[in-house]
Amino acid sequence: MGKETEYKLAVGDLQLLDCILCSRMVTEKLCAPYAYIRMRTTYYDTEDGFLEKRRWMLRLRTEDGRSVVTMKTPGEGHTRGEWEVESEYLDEALSKLAALGAPQELASLQPDALAPICGASFTRITAELRLTDDTACMICGDVGDLTGGGRTALLCELELELKQGNEAALTAFAQELMDTYCLSEQPLSKLQCARALAE
């Protein structure tokens, strides 16, 4: 199974996010300068909420012109199932995701039964951090808008995603950031926040 181990921290203030990304605590761990990636995401589900009932997420995201279809499923703690394929179209991506190990029910869905339900448009400020000799993570500051039901809300959050090594080192770094900047974990995904706008 594809896996993602991630901390998502609510920031809510653009100046605070900039302060965190430029802090010594972060910059002394940078492996390379920050990249700025423009992202546009559309989330899909069936009319009867087939994916929502299972707490699955299916999205089509363009990342600086590159299109990726991603499937995520619940996991334990900060780890989730995640599979992705480079594709501009859901119909060709569903069977490929299932072949990679995503739930097989995905392949049986009719693409025309899936409809956009909400979305997000944001800039991702991202770089790899070296936390310890054997542990690295991606730090991502996401700034933009969530959209759903004709409504829009500000998106401003920080993500830490384990790339290799020890989850305990990632947890310790996330806790250090939370303690230093009075942050809390964001319990809701971008999908959940955007979907709430449409309700």
Predicted feature descriptions by range:
Residues M1-E199:
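Phosphate-end processing signature that detects enzymes handling 5′-triphosphorylated RNA
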